UniProtKB/Swiss-Prot annotation:
Pfam families: HVSL (PF09749). InterPro entries: Cyclic_Pdiesterase (IPR009097), Usb1 (IPR027521). Residues 1-72 are annotated as: Disordered. Its main location: nucleus. Keywords: Hydrolase, Lyase, Nuclease, Nucleus. 3'-5' RNA exonuclease that trims the 3' end of oligo(U) and oligo(A) tracts of the pre-U6 small nuclear RNA (snRNA) molecule, leading to the formation of a mature U6 snRNA 3' end-terminated with a 2',3'-cyclic phosphate. Participates in the U6 snRNA 3' end processing that prevents U6 snRNA degradation. In addition also removes uridines from the 3' end of U6atac snRNA and possibly the vault RNA VTRNA1-1. Its EC number is 4.6.1.-. It is found in: Nucleus. This is U6 snRNA phosphodiesterase 1. The lineage of its organism: Eukaryota, Metazoa, Chordata, Craniata, Vertebrata. HAMAP family: USB1. GO terms for cellular component: intercellular bridge; nucleoplasm; nucleus. AMP binds at H122, L123, S124, Y204, D206, P207, S208, F209, H210, V211, S212.
Length: 267
């Protein structure tokens, strides 16, 4: 059996949670006073816990509690000041697309009951990487410059395929792109140039561009490849107006860094 293609998500799903939040940098006090004059004494009283609890620290990232994220495990440990960053093309699901999912998911769950629908849909143009907080705005500006020349285009995603993340801790059912591949390669080429400028990991050598539909914890390839994949493909092929439904207009590139989103409209 061939190995399932890899997807560019972190194990905790960079698209559905911030891996880290920015760390504030304390500034040294001025400590200035006139020559020969002692500074005024000061006394700092402790802040009551009841008050501190009203204002969670922005320097602390989310706890690495996999139970809070559907059993997902972080690919990289949280460090203060590090932001998980992901570049992608968003896909806004309409009612007809949800109707298709309502048929696909129950069939897939017959083979892998732990499967759940993705909370949002997108097509990745990068792996999930870690940015230092002070890199975010320069990174986004360079990315915007690289994306400025790209025009909107249609692509079709209609081939059912099974994916895993690099650590084999999550499995995905996706719809692979069957048209528009060349345009995505051009975009990834520019995204990779940005990554190299910031000494970050580039995208996969031979990417399989796709929109993930559902996922589960663990390596479920044995359950999902073969008969299940074939049955899901038949559902897609026979679904009413699937040819038009799965033809998507790429209108913008989006960068998610921690809990911040940056949109770059295509021309």
């Amino acid at each position: 059996m061939n190995a399932a293609p890899l997807v560019g998500y972190s194990s905790s799903g960079s698209e559905d949670e911030a891996e880290a939040v920015a760390a504030g940098r304390s500034k040294p006090g001025s400590g200035l006073h006139r020559c020969g004059q002692n500074p005024l004494p000061s006394q700092r009283f402790p802040v009551p816990d009841s008050v501190l609890n009203m204002f969670p620290s922005t320097e602390e990232g989310p706890e690495d509690d996999s139970a809070r994220h559907g059993g997902r495990i972080r690919t990289f440990p949280h460090e203060r000041g590090n932001w998980a960053t992901h570049i992608y093309i968003p896909y806004e699901a309409n009612e007809e697309f949800q109707d298709l999912l309502d048929v696909l998911l129950p069939r897939a769950q017959m083979f892998a009951p732990r499967l759940v629908q993705m909370e949002e849909f997108h097509l990745s143009l990068s792996q999930s990487v870690v940015l230092r907080h002070h890199w975010i705005l320069p990174f986004v500006q360079v990315l915007k410059d690289r994306m400025a020349s790209f025009q909107r285009f249609f692509f079709t995603a209609n081939r059912v395929k099974i994916y895993t993340n690099q650590e084999k801790t999550r499995t995905f059912i996706g719809l692979e792109v069957s048209s528009g591949h060349a345009q995505f390669l051009d975009m990834v080429s520019e995204v990779d140039r940005v990554m190299k400028e910031f000494d970050l990991t580039t995208f996969y050598q031979d990417p399989s561009f796709h929109v993930s539909l559902a996922w589960c914890v663990g390596d479920a390839r044995l359950q999902l490849e073969g008969q299940c994949q074939q049955e899901l493909q038949e559902i897609v092929d026979e679904f009413e107006d699937s040819e038009m439904l799965l033809r998507v207009l790429a209108e913008q590139v989006r960068c998610k860094s921690g809990n911040k989103f940056f949109s770059m409209p295509l021309k």
